[in-house]
């Protein structure tokens, strides 16, 4: 299962969260099955988002869509966004 990990700094978490919740990328329509928003404990102005997809094609298309969004008005609520596509190798609840 491919996961897109996005990470970036935010000048204001609250303003960024409002933009994220407005869902300009249409997460469900883009194939996102599940996502998590993470914050760094010692740097609350840095966020990471993990988005799970069924296939690599959807993940790659989503990253392209996000690059377009990042080059638009999203610049006001985030700094230096970066996306990577990773594969889950192992996961287990203990």
Where are these regions (language model features)?
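Short, surface-exposed ligand-recognition loops at beta-strand->loop->(often short) alpha-helix junctions
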Residues: 9-19
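Short hydrophobic/aromatic beta-strand micro-patches
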Residues: 7-9, 50-52
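Surface-exposed aromatic
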Residues: 44-48
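An amphipathic, aromatic/His-enriched active-site/gating alpha helix that lines ligand/cofactor pockets
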Residues: 17-36, 52-85
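Short structural boundary motif marking the start of a folded domain
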Residues: 1-4
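Short, low-order "capping/linker" segments at domain edges
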Residues: 86-94
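A short beta-turn/loop motif at secondary-structure boundaries
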Residues: 38-43
């Amino acid at each position: 299962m491919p996961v897109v990990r996005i990470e970036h700094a935010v000048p204001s978490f609250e303003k960024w969260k409002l933009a994220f919740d407005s869902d300009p990328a249409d997460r469900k329509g883009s194939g996102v099955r599940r996502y998590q928003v993470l914050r760094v404990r010692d740097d609350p102005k840095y966020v990471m988002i993990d988005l799970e997809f069924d296939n690599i094609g959807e993940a790659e298309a989503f990253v392209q869509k996000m690059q377009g969004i990042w080059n638009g008005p999203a610049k006001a609520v985030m700094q230096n966004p970066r996306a990577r596509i990773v594969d889950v190798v192992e996961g287990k609840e203990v």
